[in-house]
Swiss-Prot record:
NCBIfam families: S16. This is Small ribosomal subunit protein bS16. InterPro entries: Ribosomal_bS16, Ribosomal_bS16_CS, Ribosomal_bS16_dom_sf. HAMAP family: Ribosomal_bS16. Keywords: Ribonucleoprotein, Ribosomal protein. The gene is rpsP. PANTHER family: 30S RIBOSOMAL PROTEIN S16, SMALL RIBOSOMAL SUBUNIT PROTEIN BS16M. One of its GO terms (molecular function) is structural constituent of ribosome. GO terms for cellular component: cytoplasm; small ribosomal subunit. It comes from the Bacteria. GO terms for biological process: translation. Belongs to the bacterial ribosomal protein bS16 family.
């Protein structure tokens, strides 16, 4: 099953997450199909916290991809920010 989920990056104690489309059988930080955005929970000042390609997210959801709980919340926030 294809899922849209967070893949952790960054340094120790400084998380940075890529929002990726991946097969659910692959490891969290392993192989993915497509990177559709990023989430930086520790962004300061003018740094960007969230960037999502909503067109590609819509494409994958229409194709049948499931979203993790956290990614669903981030998508909702991104839609609210663009509206």
């Amino acid at each position: 099953m294809v899922t849209i989920r967070l893949a952790r990056g960054g340094a120790k104690k400084r998380p940075f997450y890529n929002i990726v489309v991946a097969d659910s059988r692959n490891a969290r930080d392993g192989r993915f199909i497509e990177r559709v955005g990023f989430f930086n929970p520790l962004a300061r000042g003018q740094e960007e916290t969230l960037r999502l390609d909503l067109d590609r997210v819509e494409h994958w959801v229409a194709t049948g991809a499931a979203t993790s709980d956290r990614v669903a919340k981030l998508i909702k926030d991104a839609r609210k920010a663009t509206a």
